[in-house]
Amino acid sequence: MEHSRGDSVEAGEEEEGRGGWDSRSAGTFSSSCTDCSSYCSSDLEPEWLDRVQKNGELFYLELSEGEEEILLPLSPLEPVGVNHVRFSDNEAEILPEDRKNVRKNSEPRFRKLAKMLKKKNNKKGSAELNRQACPTSILKQNSRQKPGIIVHYQYRDTCLYVNPDHLPEDEHKKTSNLLQALIGIVHQSSRNSKRSERQGRQESNQRLSNQEKLVVHGFIPGSPAIRCGQVLIGDTLVAVNDVEVHVENIERVLSCIPGPMQLKLTFETPVLYSGMGLKNQNNQAQTSINDLASLVWGDEHTNSQQDLQHMPHIVMYLTLRLDSETSKEEQEILYQYPVSDASHKLKSIRGLFLTLGDMLQNVTGAPIVSSSLILNGELVHVSYWKENDKLFLISVPAQRFPLLQLKNVTADLVRTLKFMYSTLDRAFCQAENISRLDHFFSLFFQRVLRVFLLSGITGYGPQFYDACSSLLVENLPGVRWLSLPEDIKIQIDTVLSDLEALDFAELSEDYYEMRRLYMIIGTCIFYKGYLLSNHLPKEDLVDVVLYCRQYCLLALASERIGQLIIWREVYPRYHLKHCGSPATEECSEPGGRYFLLIVGLKHFMLCTLLEAGGCTSKATGNPGPDYIYVDQVKATLLQLEMLDLNLEERLGSAPNPCLSCADWFLPSARDKLGNFTSSIVLNKLQTPKRTTSPVSKRRLFAEAASSLRTRRPSPTRSSGGSDSGTDGAGESVGVITHSSPDMARKFGRRESLGSGGSDGSGGSGTLLKINKKKYSLPNPFSSASLRKNLSERETDDIYNTIKLTSGPENTLFHYLYFETLQGVFISPTHKEVEQLGGSIHPQLIKNFHRCCLSIRSVFQQALNKKNSKHSDSKACVDVAGFDPIKEHGVLFECSPENWNDQKKSPPTMSYWVVGRLFMHPQPQELYVCFHDSVTEISVELAFKLSFGIPL
């Protein structure tokens, strides 16, 4: 399974299933030196080594020490993503018994292997142990009950996060204090506690009955037991991770904990009244499907699981070629998820789907894309993807998922499956992939339902913005780009280039005198889900982003993870498409195998695409991750940790370009600010001094921010662009020549030099400046404009603040720019949107993304017609200057929802959502949302200034 962090892989099976490397590619050297991980000279072994599956795949997740207690569910289920201990009746093991080459030297992350406890059971105890395949049940009733009294025992499971790495060195030597130092439970032993030790060898049951129980007598301040709040004085600790414990073996069991993990402690509480039955809860280990979802979404995951049970949804992979000789029932179904009552009715009408997928194409000549039907009074959308004689379809309720979004998501799912398994047939027709696909689609439907639930949340916050933006963002074949100052970007690119060069001692060919195992195709690095730098081809970047998006890795990186390591073989279509094409004169790529390595530390996540074969060693079998490459990627991330503060400062900085809140433009707000021109702040700003130092300017703006607590309203709609340059506006042109984002948000306006009219000089009138040089938004893909460090951001905002709209007011509410050539898009960050607040602005954000989804569907139809072979392109003369530019816009009118004044009608505000598609030199999409007062000339200017990229 893809996310099988909680699954244990036996060492014997692992060695049989894991592949190695072709020794012939290493020349005359010994085959024992072909796998670097097998002859490591170090005495340390990676903590993730036991998690590598038989097919070579690895998914290892370890949360940070502070976040693990919060994010992991407090349930008596087996923890995930951390090191495990394998327990038996009276023993605790770290590695399987057949594990070889045990390492002795260790560092804080690699705990010393504890000595295995010797079994001292007698013949009867050994026979019982052999008959039981699992640890003895701890849910036993006490046989020594007083006559006439019915005593039952309640067993309560509690999860505690423990980290033995934080214990002082002297605590490791004092093994008798582990119960207090590690868990925080104080137990006072009685005087006759060792009486059972003097009784010699007795029957196993008699021996266990004489052993002293671990009664909780107190707690250590600040310990995990105190923080948990579920452990009470008087409780009896009877088991640790389903292993029965007592005074004699508790310290030995705790000493074998290898690293940070969550322990399941089972406490016993006697109940003295009759009539209460003992409930034996059969708690099984939580699957990785729920683990990953609960880690990312927390309590929302539980709600979505319950709603999914009643939501009609299904994924099916059907075959159109049926065997008439065999009358096997449901033979046309190659794969189905889920198998539940909710999907039964959709499954029963699969014949309709097969008919539409096959016969409709024969009639119309075009494959079916989607259909809608009413099922039990509910509208359901169905999306199709046909390849050869196979039909892949997804069905979801229309209320939960728009049809336009379902079409795009279906194409993304197919692309991700091909990236993981090469073909759809290989993915759905191999039995070993069934559980992995169940995991894959379970996460998909949980994401769908979560977005729907969050979109109905009242209020405004990060979750609401996530739900609104995902409607459009998750349909874009790209990732959100975080624009950075040039010096920060150069540092990141330099570090990534050093990694890609593989010019390290253990990665060089001269170190082991052999060919390298892999060649790095490219890398891309993320911070909290934002793309910082990309060295991958665009197609590879999109494949990696879709994979990370499907498995919630971008959302997971927004949390502070301790360590994330993912390794699997992938099939990037860009490279496989260019392999072995001798017919073309272009240089074809060698036929090799490709592997994806993802390493995450804290908020950073680095994705690396590697190639085996060609100029590197040829991979055979199912090779697992090589620890040298993993360590070098970790070292790269540690090298970039110094930029953490700068990146946080960038995410928390003021919006650039500047944004306005829709609530500032309501007429009611304008009435309250009627005496704005007579304010003290404006009098201070109207001083004729222009040579004020930056320090005094910051002091002036600080005074303005503290004295002005309201927003500047928008002007009335003008008939033309030249109306913004009236005398009244001209008097204030020289007033705010240098403005900070904070000041502008308080005023709600952006003054500028120039009128922004239609005579062609409006370009300089839309940008704040102190020199005669024009400023434009930086091109994130060009190193033409150098900027200062992020530490000087507060000073630079005064001089380099940019607004896209012309006129005295900043009327830009939201924007999104999608660069198809690079596979990235730029939009305001979450913090930038949160800073605006407002009551009607959240509804504006929601309408913006919903409208952009519809506009983009029109753009996609235009692109498909252009790329279609059946389009009559020869009939039109292709002139670059006359090439059509697609533009669509929708006018909205909104008002406050909760309007209590019955005598007056609620104030209204109109705004536009406009999308434009540029065809040359490459397709580019730009979506903006602005106030209705903006003229057409101003809109044209805003498009021309789209991030400094020439049209």
From Swiss-Prot:
Compositional bias of kind Gly residues: 754-765
An annotated GO BP: establishment of planar polarity
Residue ranges, compositional bias (Basic and acidic residues): 743-752
Tissue distribution of the protein: Expressed in the neural plate during neural tube closure with subsequent strong expression in the ventral neural tube and in facial mesenchyme.
Compositional bias ranges of the Low complexity kind: 715-726
Alphabetical keyword list: Cell membrane, Cell projection, Cilium biogenesis/degradation, Cytoplasm, Cytoskeleton, Developmental protein, Membrane
Lipid metabolism keyword on record: no
Region (Disordered): 1-32, 189-208, 687-765
Location in or out of the cell: Cell surface; Cell membrane; Cytoplasm; Cytoplasm, Cytoskeleton, Cilium basal body
InterPro entries for this protein: CCZ1/INTU/HSP4_longin_1, CCZ1/INTU/HSP4_longin_3, CCZ1/INTU_longin_2, INTU, PDZ, PDZ_sf
Pfam families from the UniProt entry: Intu_longin_1 (PF19031), Intu_longin_2 (PF19032), Intu_longin_3 (PF19033)
GO CC, one annotated term: cell surface
Family affiliation: Belongs to the inturned family.
Function as written in the Swiss-Prot or TrEMBL entry: Plays a role in the definition of cell polarity via the planar cell polarity (PCP) cascade. Required for ciliogenesis by controlling the organization of the apical actin cytoskeleton and the positioning of the basal bodies at the apical cell surface, which in turn is essential for the normal orientation of elongating ciliary microtubules. Proposed to function as core component of a functional module called CPLANE (ciliogenesis and planar polarity effectors) involved in recruitment of peripheral IFT-A proteins to basal bodies.
Name of the molecule in the record: Protein inturned
Organism listed in the record: Xenopus laevis
